[in-house]
Amino acid sequence: MAKQLLFNEEARKSLLAGVEQISNAVKVTLGPKGRNVLIDKSFGAPTVTKDGVSVAREVELENKFENMGAQLLKEVATKTNDVAGDGTTTATVLAYSMVKEGLKAVAAGMTPLELKRGIDKAVAIAVEDIQKNSKEIKGSEEVAHVASVSANNDAEIGKIIADAIAKVGKDGVIDVGEAQTMETVTDYVEGMQFDRGYISSYFVTDRDRMETVFENPYILIYDKSISTMKDLLPLLEQVAQSGRPLLIIAEDVEGEALATLVVNSLRGALKTCAVKAPGFGDRRKEMLEDIAVLTGGQVVSEELGFKLEAAQISMLGQAKSIKIDKDNTMIIDGAGKSKDIKDRVTQIKAQLDATDSEYDSEKLRERLAKLSGGVAVIKIGAVTEVEMKEKKHRVEDALSATRAAIEEGIVAGGGLAMIQAIAALEKADMSSLTEDEKVGFKIVKRALEEPIRQIAENAGLDGAVIAEKAKEKKGVGFDAAKMEWTDMVKAGIIDPAKVTRSALQNAASIASLLLTTECAITDIPEKQAGPAMPSPDMGGMGMY
């Protein structure tokens, strides 16, 4: 397909036009008085959101060159969301300011590469200042403040998230789902849960709830399929003598073995239940080992030199109770030693630090949570589906922001941390910089004012005036919700340092790319074919 090209100033102007459009759509959502954006869908009701990345993802411009600029800015929001889970609107606003001021400098004859170097050096100093000023998050109250600020000053959401984290711990899994009622509730799962249910409904002990519940069971953990009874019989006889129930976790239980277990369960001779092992491939082996550590048992595996027919009762795991339905198995209060569990958690954390894969990271975090904290499910309730989706977006943002705050600490919110970083740039030694690099510093200084300007403008005030006052008032920021100057940290208006840092770094990265662009190439749009001419012998068709 033929291509069209734009060069120099013309290319950069087209890219800027695209960046500006996406920035204008996103920036209206910033701050406590930010507005919603309504997004049309090809089916169903439109989506209402205040989430910057959700808005950015929907933007697709008709002009191909402008669309390239828009897609680059979309990358800022997406990357910030991936790294920190929040701060996407701030990142977008910062990037637009850097691109706009940077392109003015390029048009005035500055060297793009030197501007880029200046921007990179300034951002490094600002990031260092943000990290230096960050404070470790302490107590549920500060967790609630971070969450409520991210959820558009919704104190109820802040409290729900703070309570969930207090219950499952900072490594615990917190899932966000949809409730069937108008009320938002949190369900807690103590112990380990995995998504495999009973193989046969004949194992059910509670017919009303269709659940299998065992108290003080033994747990056999086996990494292969069981199809014949002779391999399992020696172990079953040992368990039967103890009078305790048995849960079998294996790759599969089928044929003669399954039939015999079902018959024994129905007769009451031996309470048993069989479930398939969670996960697949190597991940399955790791998860079986996790279950073994949690329950104080041993994975019966020929790879480790253990055969099923030679398995002893001492190899079995134990728990206070287990609950199994058709989809899930929950092991409550496993008998594993706390030292072994702690060592296993440390091992998984090391794997988490070493992996680059987002998918692997997610699965490792899930395993970590199952071992160390348990699971909380926040079920979002609302009057309408549109409201529920909007609220769910805010809860997910708040949850991500809270995790980021626990990880890297908190800084003053409302754009104040960035205003304070300007002071660090003004104190920096610029004697070794070229004139163009100094302009790069000025571009970053101007961009750091932009979040507080936009928050003020969304509250109906003059952003430039508020930004100047914030620079004069040391350590005091503007609370746009109450329209007053206050100590932001004491007032609970705080942002995660990771969110602020990531927003600035990602904005600078994309801005630098745009400033150093000299040519843009895209496909020539295909011309739309006109409507077909009617056939001359069909003139009377459709006439009455």
Curated annotation (Swiss-Prot):
Paired cysteines (S-S): none
MF (Gene Ontology): ATP binding; ATP-dependent protein folding chaperone; isomerase activity; unfolded protein binding
Residues at which ATP binds: 29-32, 50, 86-90, 414, 479-481, 495
Keywords: ATP-binding, Chaperone, Cytoplasm, Isomerase, Nucleotide-binding
InterPro entries from the UniProt entry: Chaperonin_Cpn60_CS (IPR018370), Cpn60/GroEL (IPR001844), Cpn60/GroEL/TCP-1 (IPR002423), GroEL-like_apical_dom_sf (IPR027409), GROEL-like_equatorial_sf (IPR027413), TCP-1-like_intermed_sf (IPR027410)
Places the protein is found: Cytoplasm
EC annotation from Swiss-Prot or TrEMBL: 5.6.1.7
GO CC entries: cytoplasm
Major site of localization recorded for this protein: cytoplasm
Domain of life: Bacteria
Gene Ontology biological-process annotations: protein refolding
Reaction catalyzed: ATP + H2O + a folded polypeptide = ADP + phosphate + an unfolded polypeptide
Record's function text: Together with its co-chaperonin GroES, plays an essential role in assisting protein folding. The GroEL-GroES system forms a nano-cage that allows encapsulation of the non-native substrate proteins and provides a physical environment optimized to promote and accelerate protein folding.
Family matches, as HAMAP family: CH60
Protein family (similarity comment): Belongs to the chaperonin (HSP60) family.
Subunit field text: Forms a cylinder of 14 subunits composed of two heptameric rings stacked back-to-back. Interacts with the co-chaperonin GroES.
PANTHER family hit by this protein: 60 KDA HEAT SHOCK PROTEIN, MITOCHONDRIAL (PTHR45633)
Record's protein name: Chaperonin GroEL
